[in-house]
Amino acid sequence: MKLHSRFLNQVATQRYVQQGVFVVTALFLTHGGFSVLHAQEASAITVQEKIFGTPDQIFEKAVSLFFDAKPGESAVVFDQLIQVQPECQPGLWQRGLALYYADRFVEGQKQFELHRTVNPNDVENPAWHYLCVARATSPENARQHMLAVGQDLRVPMKQILELYQGDGSEENVLMHAARGDSQQQRNQLCYAHLYLGLYAEVNGNIGKAKGHILQAAETYSMDHYMGRVANVHARVRGWLLPVE
């Protein structure tokens, strides 16, 4: 998935809109009543930030814990972020990944369903939704309830989606991932092996899953968010990858 660097700016805009609604409603009150309500809202935010930190600090802590292969702790911190700033939850696909590796699959499923409302064209979102549902119920049920998605032009995301939907193949994913120049191939093969490994794992083929994940984490390693997810996966599963 794409790491949205403007994450907190988007949240700030959402908060501004919500506060605008609050102000319009408050105009029907006395000036004194408005002041009390505004002060109470500000006070609640201040208390939460004193307990957990600012939204930026909480987000950074959650991500850091995740990449330290501590998804359970990471998920708890992401929960704190939602408590401090509830309007940010739809954008938090990173929380969905932490929930998956923390074995909180139903909550992960709901996170990816919510994320679709703000990011409807990212194939990785229905893929992770599938993985959560497959672990919570079964791969067959997950396939029947896959989220609809728009067009994602990244290679080999279309082929990965087809595989998860039951219409594609591992060979087709790898064939498309091996196209382009050497740098493109490395990135594409990192994604391909990550999602092939995830798919193999939820379908019970642990040996194949390990092979794919280690290729994504080592042979075709990338330092972007999803490349590092492969590393986290290997470490969480105890597949003998050194700690970063």
Task: Name the predicted role of every residue range.
Residues S64, A98, C132-A134, Y199:
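Residue-level signature for tetratricopeptide repeat
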Residues G53-Q80, V84, A192-Y199:
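Alpha-helical segment of the N-proximal tetratricopeptide repeat
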